[in-house]
């Protein structure tokens, strides 16, 4: 598509996997003008509803848009989902400068401290720890995670934290409020899961 600008990594081995996302916070990354609204999304999201409310979200200046990963029992270690970050270009440059000073240290730190599960992880912990802007929390009911191995835990957290009346997922359908579904975790590949709803929304 002519409106899509693909930016190749100059050195894919410079950082470990998802830690490359920290580059997005470098001021004017990809030629994006200072002050332009940015949204970082991981590639393992599936859009299941109307996301206009997300794309048009009125994020105040000098704030960081995120949501609480309600499905996790480790929120005391890291509250945000690193696969969704909303900000204005230039406001988060400090994340990049802090990381760039000691990338080897930070890429191992949260795993060594028992705050993230290896072999590669911790970038969302880094952002959660080092973001200096006020946070704006988008509604939790817009977002969900799908992981068959954690279904009952996710369902329980949904009822306890988000919606006591409706299930988050039943008979191949998500709750009407859910707009995006994340397949986080290294062993949770959406292309390997054979469910009709994935075909309906993704392929």
Predicted regions and their residues:
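A generic structural signal for well-ordered coil/turn residues at beta-strand boundaries
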Residues: 80-81, 177
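Catalytic core and acceptor-binding pocket of nucleotide-sugar-dependent glycosyltransferases
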Residues: 89-203
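Aromatic-acidic/polar surface patches that form glycan- and anion
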Residues: 14, 18, 74-78, 115-120, ...
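GT-A fold catalytic core of metal-dependent nucleotide-sugar glycosyltransferases
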Residues: 6-8, 17-80, 86-89
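N-terminal anchoring/stem segment of glycosyltransferases
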Residues: 1-17, 29-34, 185, 189, ...
């Amino acid at each position: 598509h002519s409106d899509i600008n693909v930016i190749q990594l100059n050195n894919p081995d410079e950082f470990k996997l998802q830690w490359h996302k920290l580059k997005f916070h470098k001021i004017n990354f990809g030629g994006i003008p200072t002050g332009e609204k940015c949204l970082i999304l991981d590639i393992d999201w599936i859009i299941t509803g109307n996301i206009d409310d997300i794309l048009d979200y009125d994020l105040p200046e000098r704030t960081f848009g995120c949501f609480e990963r309600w499905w996790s029992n480790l929120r005391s270690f890291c509250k945000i989902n690193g696969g969704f970050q909303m900000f204005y270009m230039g406001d988060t440059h400090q994340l990049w400068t802090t990381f760039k000073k000691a990338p080897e240290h930070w890429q191992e730190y949260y795993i060594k401290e028992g705050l993230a599960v290896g072999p590669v992880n911790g970038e969302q912990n880094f952002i959660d720890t080092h973001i200096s802007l006020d946070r704006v929390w988008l509604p939790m009911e817009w977002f969900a995670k799908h992981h068959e191995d954690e279904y009952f835990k996710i369902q329980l957290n949904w009822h306890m934290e988000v919606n006591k009346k409706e299930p988050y997922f039943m008979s191949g359908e998500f709750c009407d409020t859910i707009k995006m579904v994340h397949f986080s975790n290294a062993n949770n590949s959406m292309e390997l899961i054979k469910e009709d709803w994935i075909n309906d929304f993704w392929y």
